[in-house]
């Protein structure tokens, strides 16, 4: 999509960042996420919204790309929701890209999810285009 603008666009990262898993683990972690998604769905481990939330969070944690990981993670969760007959989350990406109260709440919800507390992030996934 942006390959003509940024050479790294859409390519799995091979360099270390201050966030995300080690670069050599990215592909393994994506495979584990894919396997977990299949397991969660087959075993009805979580509701669709909670599964989408966990997909979003894990994709952020993995941090597969040099840039755009938040947008990609939110899109991935929305694709899962659409595949499961739910409307996508209304993220307001323009507000998440700059410092403000909504971005702060979003970052805080991701940090809580890092500790296993998904409630705030699940609540954010409940704000869909149906509303």
Listing of model-derived features with the role each one plays in the protein:
Residues 1-131:
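FIC/Doc superfamily catalytic core
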């Amino acid at each position: 999509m942006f390959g003509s603008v940024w050479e790294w666009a859409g390519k799995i990262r091979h360099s270390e960042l201050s966030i995300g898993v080690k670069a050599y683990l990215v592909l393994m972690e994506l495979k584990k996420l894919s396997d977990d998604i299949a397991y969660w769905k087959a075993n009805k481990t979580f509701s669709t919204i909670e599964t989408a939330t966990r997909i979003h969070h894990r994709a952020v944690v993995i941090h597969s790309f040099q840039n755009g990981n938040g947008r990609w993670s939110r899109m991935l969760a929305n694709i899962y929701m659409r595949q499961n007959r739910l409307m996508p989350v209304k993220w307001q990406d323009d507000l998440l890209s700059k410092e403000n109260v909504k971005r702060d709440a979003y970052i805080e919800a991701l940090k809580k999810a890092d500790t296993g507390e998904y409630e705030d992030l699940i609540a954010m996934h409940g704000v869909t285009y149906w509303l």
